[in-house]
Structures are given as C-alpha cells and as structure tokens.
Amino acid sequence: LNNAGEPVTGTRESRTTTSARLSSFGLEDGPMTTAVLAERRPATETLHVLTSFDEVRAATETVAASGQRLISIMTPDLEPEIYDQAALLEIIKRFVLGHSFAKVRVLMRDQARLSGGANRFIAMAHRLTSYLEIRIRAPQYRELTAAYCIADDRAIVYRLRADRAEGIAGFNNPPIARQYLQEFDAVWQASAIEEREVRVARS
C-alpha cells in the first residue's frame, strides 16, 4: 500500500527486473530500451535468451536466413562452432547469390586466432569477393569482447562475451539491431585503413 492506502502496482519491480536483465547482456536501460519495450507488439518480437552454443548456432542461422540485403558479423575469429558449419555456409551462399546487391561484412579481432587450418567461411569469402568482405578491427577496437550477427537492421544474435554462449536473439527487433549496427558501422569505417587480406591457412 502507498501513503494513500492504495495498492501499489508492479511497474517499478517490472522495470527493475527488465533493467537487470538487459544489463546482464550489456544493454543499457535508456531511450533504446524504452523503444524496445514500446515496440513489443506482434510487429516486433521480444528478445530470446540463449544459454548454449547450440542455441547460438541455431539463432545465427535463423538471423542470417532472414537477411535481404546486408549481414554484419562481429567476431574474434569466425568462431568455427558457429560460422564454419555447413548449414550456415549454405545460408550465406544462398543469401549472396539470391539477392541483388547483397553484402556480407565481417569484422575480426585478428587472424592469428584462426585455428585448425583453413576456415571454410574464409575460403568462401575468397570465392565470392564481390559479396563478402572481411576486415581486421582497428587497434582501438581489438579489445571489444562482444560477438554478434545482424541481418539488415532488424534481426540480431548478440553475446556480451564471444567466449561464452549466454546471449540474446531478436528475430524481428529493429531497435536492438540498429543499436549494434550503428556500433558495427563505426568500427567498420575505422578499420578501413587497417584492412588487409585474410589468407586461408594452408598445410
């Protein structure tokens, strides 16, 4: 009860819970969060919590398959458990060959972390150079820990730490997708002068 003897609603508790959950994934409870909450109607899906790499892989495939013109990937090393998988590679290939002006952009932390020899995603990028571009992140962005995949400006899979499976997925959530697409674009532009060819390791 409040001072007037009236029952208190759960609005404050709900807001606190929402803030804590978003904060745990590195999302700020601010104007962007307000936009997300305001758009939680049938036209915009809520965020799905991911707890395993199997879920991350499946969500990444769903996000990539929804792309119409642009896929943007932030990753330390094109994580093989996610991106060097036959299903995802086929989705990417169909995306770039099936859509006019389609583009896939990848920002990697460094090439040295590629392990186990050739990465099939990079091999595909060498075959489809008009559609896939890979850049090494500029030095000031090398320590970013997040990993995500964004389709157009609407769908996203996001993890605060690339070495952990915990994350979120929004398959139709423009506010969150645009928030991180803006970050990606800034890193992409800053990394232009650092751009270098990423070579496939050969035995």
Model-derived regions, located:
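Long, hydrophobic, amphipathic alpha-helical segments used as structural scaffolds
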Residues: 75, 103, 108, 136, ...
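Primarily the HKD phosphodiesterase
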Residues: 63-128
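HKD (HxKxxxxD) catalytic microenvironment of the phospholipase D
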Residues: 133-177
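Acidic/glycine-enriched edge-of-secondary-structure segments
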Residues: 37-54, 69-82
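Signature of lipid phosphatidyltransferase scaffolds
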Residues: 3-5, 10-38, 160-203
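A short, well-structured juxtamembrane/interface segment
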Residues: 55-59
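Mid-sequence acidic-hydrophobic segments that form the walls
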Residues: 124-131, 156, 187-190
